[in-house]
Amino acid sequence: MTAVLLGAALTLLALPAATARIGRRLRPSEWARFCAVALAAGALLLEIGLLAWAAPTLLRAVGVPSLASACDRLLSLLTVGGEGLGWAAAVSATILPLVAAVTAGRLRAGRRSVARELWLGEGRTIAGQLVVVLPIDRPLAISFADPEPTIVVSTGLLEALEPHEVEAVVRHEVAHLVHRHQPLLCLVALITAAFGWLPPVRSSAGALHLALERWADEVAAGTCPVERLVVRDALLHLAIVEEAPLGMAAFSPAETVSSRMAALEAPPSPPSLMKHALLYLPGTGASLVAIPALLAWTTQANAVLAMAGRCPV
């Protein structure tokens, strides 16, 4: 059962990377939600699977399992790979939440650090929005929603772009705030920190990041060909822009620029109805397999716990 849970989890985590060719042809908002659900569900299911794998080993270690044959039979249904792999699963199940917690702490600290420096800048209205302009020579455009919605640009960015391009950049950052992208950007950071050593999962996190940036591009540019070229030109001028602090939205992270420029120049044609439906089949299948496995494991685990008091120690 645990092998099924782990298999379904890894399938979901790798799904955005595996289906990116079709997914990029969807509306960026739909593709971003698809990626986010797959990554969040996969990470949660993986943690549950590791805990399920480790549970028999941990129960034996604390003296709960007995030597009675009935208990042994039940425990054998739960145990996969022996004590060694059980302890490895226990360690992994502990490390992953710790990595996530540390990364989440870094995200909060990064946002608060930037917020503390805002007094150095001046407020200015750009594209109808209040923007903080920091005296930094390097081009910079970021936004974050916590502790309060804020858009920050640098004097270097104002000097590097034409006024209408600056307005496009600000509209892009407004889109991130209005559509609540910060939690999803944090999810990208958490998945990358915890699973970035797995290339397919790292690619899936990158797919979500690109989808969020394209989503904001589409809101900023709309359907007007001229405005789409304005956003594209701003990206072109800032193609080697800074990296934003973790969990914040930057206008032009380098790894997303080329794909975004191509989409702005020539929006991809939507996939056929058949391909659109097929995109959702793997994730649906993984979920339909994982849910019965999780229910079966829970039933077996409850049986073990119920019998623990009657089994000889």
What positions do the PLM features span?
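Peri-catalytic and regulatory segments of divalent metal-dependent proteins
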Residues: 88-174, 179
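Cytoplasmic membrane-interface segments at the C-terminal ends of transmembrane helices
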Residues: 16-31, 56, 98-125, 224, ...
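Hydrophobic membrane-embedded segments
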Residues: 47-96, 305-312
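Acidic/histidine metal-binding catalytic segments
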Residues: 187-188, 226-236
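Membrane-anchoring/interfacial helices and their immediately flanking loops
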Residues: 1-43
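Cytosolic-facing loops and C-terminal tails of multi-pass membrane proteins
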Residues: 2-17, 82-113, 230, 237-313
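Catalytic Zn2+-binding segment of zinc metalloproteases
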Residues: 174-193
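An active-site-proximal "capping" alpha-helix that borders the catalytic cofactor pocket
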Residues: 210-224
